[in-house]
């Protein structure tokens, strides 16, 4: 599982040769924790899509940039 930050977002997402599934999440979010195993399974089952996670508490600039108002 790829951890996406403001430092690697451009390289890992915008310049990726593959489609990218980005999961915006937070450790305090119960539904996010419920979805996490499903997101992890998607990442393991396919190599056609890159899967990454953005912790909205640690990367609030990215959450703001993409107008993430609530999660999940």
What is each residue range found by the language model?
Residues 18, 24-28, 70:
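Short pre-active-site segment immediately N-terminal to redox-active cysteine/selenocysteine motifs
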Residues 30-33:
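Cys/His/Pro-rich metal-binding microdomains
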Residues 63-71:
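Thiol/disulfide oxidoreductase modules built on the thioredoxin-like
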């Amino acid at each position: 599982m790829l951890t996406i930050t403001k430092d690697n977002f451009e390289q890992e997402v915008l310049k990726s040769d593959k489609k990218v599934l980005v999961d915006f999440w937070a450790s305090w979010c119960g539904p996010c924790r419920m979805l996490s195993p499903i997101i992890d399974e998607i990442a393991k089952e396919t190599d056609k899509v890159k899967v990454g996670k953005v912790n909205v508490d640690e990367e609030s600039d990215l959450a703001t940039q993409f107008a993430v108002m609530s999660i999940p």
